[in-house]
Amino acid sequence: MANTASARKRIRQNERRNARNTARVSRMRTFVKKVEAAIASGNKDEATAALRAAQPEMQRASGKGVIHANTVARKISRLSARIKSIVAA
């Protein structure tokens, strides 16, 4: 248990931040799942629209420091490549 007032305050801050960050990651994952579902259905237009909606959410999570910027770039790149492969097939 925290002994000092500042340590108790830090615990409160960490709990709030943890809840906020968890919500951000969850929201981002939901958007990514929508993109993956659209890719699985084979609908290129739907997948493109879903990626267009997911991209700002992913970048926002990166900007807030929830996940690393390179991770977001890699995920966006891989999703884009999968959408392009729908067109080629």
Swiss-Prot record:
Gene3D superfamilies: Ribosomal protein S20. This is Small ribosomal subunit protein bS20. The keyword Acyltransferase does not apply. Keywords: Ribonucleoprotein, Ribosomal protein, RNA-binding, rRNA-binding. Binds directly to 16S ribosomal RNA. One of its GO terms (biological process) is translation. The gene is rpsT. It holds the Pfam family Ribosomal_S20p. Residues 1-24 are annotated as: Disordered. Belongs to the bacterial ribosomal protein bS20 family. GO terms for molecular function: small ribosomal subunit rRNA binding; structural constituent of ribosome. It comes from Gluconacetobacter diazotrophicus (strain ATCC 49037 / DSM 5601 / CCUG 37298 / CIP 103539 / LMG 7603 / PAl5). It comes from the Bacteria. GO terms for cellular component: small ribosomal subunit.
